[in-house]
Amino acid sequence: MNQERLNEIEKPLLHLVERDVVPALGCTEPISLALAAATAAKYLGKTPERIEAKVSPNLMKNGLGVAVPGTGMVGLPIAAAIGALGGDPEGELEVLKHITPEQVSQAKAMLDNKLVNVDIHQTEHILYSEAVLFADNDRVKVAIQDQHTNIILIEKNGEVVFEKEQDECADCDPYDIFKQVSAREIFEFSCEVELDKIRFIGQAAALNSALSNEGLRENYGLHIGRTLRKQVGSGLMSDDLLSKIMIETTAASDARMGGATLPAMSNSGSGNQGIAATMPVVVVADYLNVSEEKRLRALFLSHLMAIYIHSKLPKLSALCAVTTASMGSCAGIAYLLTGKFETVSMGICSMIGDISGIICDGASNSCAMKVSTSVASGYKSVLMAMDETHVTGNEGIVEHDLDRTIDNLCSIASKSMHHIDCQVIEIMVSKPCP
């Protein structure tokens, strides 16, 4: 890549990674509602007596069955209650970082007394959360839309305190840069950008490794990571690099989905996507004992490639986005093992031929299953590419060009899978109570 082109794309690409790779405590969909409630509580100025919340169907899907960190409970009602009673309105995706046991008890009491209600709000916006808090004769409403922390409305007693213009940033979509760059340029940029400008990505390894260690220390969620490690000890699984990738990555997801009070470094608004883009690269880099520079460039490539692919998808969809985030770590591993774009291209094409169509049926402990499947596919696909074999453009939705293959996958997710999404949500909200 020539210096002029590097300079042209450097600022927007760095901005995107800094914007989309951020710490998040807890699954980001219920956290978005918690942030709306915390902000409403700030403007209410007193302890709320009742909470009425509304969320988009996709946010409901991702909030029904997932643990809310620090509470020992799952679901959107507890997220709204603890956000209102103990959330930090300035904390963004770490809104619940400083909650106390007393506040958790108060939040649970609100639920027991049926003072918190969460309904589906039919809206054209895939990501939408709204919290309305009541106390005495006061009422505060806060709405978040399109991005997990994008507050668009604050209203108190019917008067608008803050309202973001809907077209405020219509002409400055930060993802527009991806209309001008290719996957090859993503690779070349990651290899050539000044190292000091991407050192911040090392924090992703630190945060998600800590989460992985926590997931191996205690039984969280389905404790898949611990189970696989146990079976390595019993001899039923090999103690090899693939097993290490699956165990350490899945353990981080176990802890995250099981309610651990440690932040994940997220990607594209998702902690699991951040984990899938980080941990396989960390494990392989440690195994190879590579230099700090190579490690950082591999991590940066992984996260940027994951953002690049996810930018072509709806913010929330019926396609499990851990699969696309794992395509990022596939690129990072390919860089570590060969340093060649051709390996990256063959690897991602094979992944698309392998795990396309895994559905998102809501955030839950079972997300860790999809994480283990996706990262295993990524490593397998790199090994195939190193042996000059891959799913070719003669097969299925894969084409001879990586960017066209990515576009095909994302087109299916954006169009055809919309009907799947509706049916998944219908099934989830109509299940009988156990």
Name what the model sees in each region.
Residues 2-14, 45-59, 240-259, 291-309, ...:
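Acidic-glycine-rich active-site phosphate/pyrophosphate-binding loop
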Residues 4-5, 25-28, 58-62, 145-162, ...:
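A structural signal for small-residue-enriched, beta-sheet-centric alpha/beta enzyme cores
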Residues 23-39, 262-279, 320-324:
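Conserved phosphate/anionic-ligand binding catalytic regions in large, soluble enzymes, centered on
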Residues 112-259, 426-434:
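Signature of multi-pass transmembrane helix bundles
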Residues 47-51, 91-96, 118-119, 195-201, ...:
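Flexible, glycine/charged-enriched surface loops at secondary-structure junctions
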Residues 13-23, 58-66, 255-266, 306-316, ...:
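Glycine/charged-rich beta-loop-alpha catalytic/anionic-binding loops adjacent to active sites
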Residues 34-130:
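Early transmembrane hairpin of solute transport permeases
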Residues 40-43, 284-297, 301, 307-373, ...:
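Hydrophobic alpha-helical bundle architecture
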